């Protein structure tokens, strides 16, 4: 259900303007909401893993769930970190500084240098070591792209065990096979798939009504297919199409906008392969995956795009 835009932030981006305020506002996530009822009713809160393709609401669900659990102390007791973000030079300098035990210290460790997993030491440990603020018994740490940790996962498992009384982890990943078994066995697993077509189309129709956008009856379903059920991408596509067609969207105007958004990247990818520029092709493919497109979507797009390229010229 779309929130009343008057009660929202006045963002120019519809995907932010119509972002859900609570779990109840999330469409098409009935299984997830049913599975978390016990936590919200005061039950034992487990560590969790949210798995699924990019763009299906995993991070939004994690933040909304954390906010409902923590209440007024949400800002103080919840933190989100990104495993895909590189460690900064300042963080590395701090790790080096703290990994050395001064010779002025008493004991066998004096003068020794330790090696710490950079991500865990700089972004996880400082948060989990501090006790919850206020009346809450636990804090919540959300880690996006958890599969990127790779070798640091064993160290993370030990932190999970050590601070399990005061901190819960929500791990977000689109590569569940890259998460080690000891962590999987300690977490409640939730899978996020694309929302059903009926719920998606109803949302698009409600937004169009609130934004005074005129659409053909087939447009919501066309948007659903174009973005493979990703709500945020669907709302962005709707806004872009509305801006380019004076708020009157038909199949042709929608096709032009959607085709432009991915067609250029696919075009460059194919041309790079044919010209043996594999580094450029790999970068484009990774950028499309990072943008949330699945392998099957990219392959379908490549099959369509290849027919429009002057291959006889490119092969010369």
Language model segments and positions:
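C-terminal helical "lid" of AAA+/P-loop NTPase domains
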Residues: 220-226, 232-246, 268-271, 282-287, ...
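Conserved C-terminal helix/linker of AAA+ ATPases
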Residues: 238, 242-267, 299-300, 315-316
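Helix-rich C-terminal "collar"/helical-bundle subdomain used as an assembly and partner-interaction module
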Residues: 1-4, 269-316
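Alpha-helix N-cap/N′ positions at the starts of helices
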Residues: 18, 141, 215-218, 249, ...
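Conserved AAA+ ATPase "SRH/arginine-finger" region at the nucleotide-binding site
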Residues: 188-200
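A short helix-loop-helix "switch/interaction" segment in the helical subdomain of ASCE P-loop NTPases
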Residues: 51, 55, 209, 218-232, ...
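An amphipathic alpha-helix signature
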Residues: 121, 197-205, 217-224, 282
């Amino acid at each position: 259900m779309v929130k009343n835009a008057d009660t929202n932030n006045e963002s120019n981006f519809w995907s932010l303007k119509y972002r859900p305020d609570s779990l109840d506002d999330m469409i098409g996530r009935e299984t997830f909401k049913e599975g978390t009822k016990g936590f919200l009713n005061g039950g034992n809160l487990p560590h969790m893993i949210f798995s699924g393709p990019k763009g299906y609401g995993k991070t939004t669900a994690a933040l909304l769930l954390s906010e409902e659990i923590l209440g007024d102390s949400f800002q103080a007791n919840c933190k989100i970190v990104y495993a895909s973000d590189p460690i900064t030079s300042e963080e590395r300098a701090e790790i080096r500084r703290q990994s050395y035990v001064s010779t002025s210290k008493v004991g066998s460790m004096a003068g020794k240098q330790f090696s710490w997993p950079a991500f865990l030491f700089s972004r996880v440990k400082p948060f989990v070591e501090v006790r919850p603020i206020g009346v809450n018994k636990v804090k919540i740490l959300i880690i996006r792209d958890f599969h990127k940790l790779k070798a640091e996962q064993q160290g993370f498992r030990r932190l999970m065990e050590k601070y399990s009384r005061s901190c819960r982890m929500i791990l977000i990943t689109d590569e569940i096979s890259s998460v080690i078994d000891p962590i999987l066995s300690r977490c409640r697993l939730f899978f996020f798939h694309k929302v059903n077509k009926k719920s998606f189309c109803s949302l698009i129709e409600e937004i169009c009504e609130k934004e005074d956008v005129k659409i053909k009856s087939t447009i919501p379903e066309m948007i659903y297919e174009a973005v493979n059920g990703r709500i945020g991408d669907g709302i962005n596509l709707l806004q872009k199409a509305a801006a380019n067609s004076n708020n009157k969207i038909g199949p042709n105007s929608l096709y032009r906008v959607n085709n432009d958004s991915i067609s250029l990247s696919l075009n460059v990818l194919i041309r790079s392969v044919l010209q043996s520029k594999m580094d450029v092709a790999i970068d484009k493919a990774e950028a499309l995956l990072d943008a949330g497109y699945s392998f099957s979507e990219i392959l379908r797009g490549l099959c369509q795009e290849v027919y429009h390229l002057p291959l006889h010229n490119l092969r010369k």
